[in-house]
Amino acid sequence: VGSEMCIRDSTLHRLIDSIAVADPYLREGARYSVDSLSEVRIRITNALRNRGYYYFRPDFIEYLADTVQQPMKMAMRMMLAADIPPAMLKRYRTGNVTMYVFRNQGGGEPDTFQTRRGTLIQMMPSRFRRELMNECVTMRTGRWFAVRQMNSTQTRLARLGIFNAINLEAE
């Protein structure tokens, strides 16, 4: 276990604490196993990644166990690893959302439309219905980036069955 790290980002500290307190497995008197503690780390990581901490990973969370205080009991402390690069703890917001719809045959003239979800650049002529993008894109400009919304957007676009490639990029 690495040395204890002072968490400079109190928002991250509060989020981890609130997620951990709500986890049904982390209760006083519970029996702990390595697999179960690993699952807790994954649940906390998933929750953080859906709240803007895109690069957060389960191995950033470490457990420190003390079995000396009382016989047959263990005091456990959860903390962040000491060697996490600061960039990995950065919180991200969704920026401008720009969607490109290209023609199968290539070519065409680009036409730009503002939708509720962002800017749509569509190569014309095209029979693609612009309102489909509002239904498929779940990300919102200015909100905390959520992996769940990114996955939902990709799934909805793929289900349309009209795209040969779906690419989500950070700029």
PLM feature spans:
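Periplasmic polypeptide-binding modules associated with outer-membrane biogenesis and secretion
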Residues: 1-171
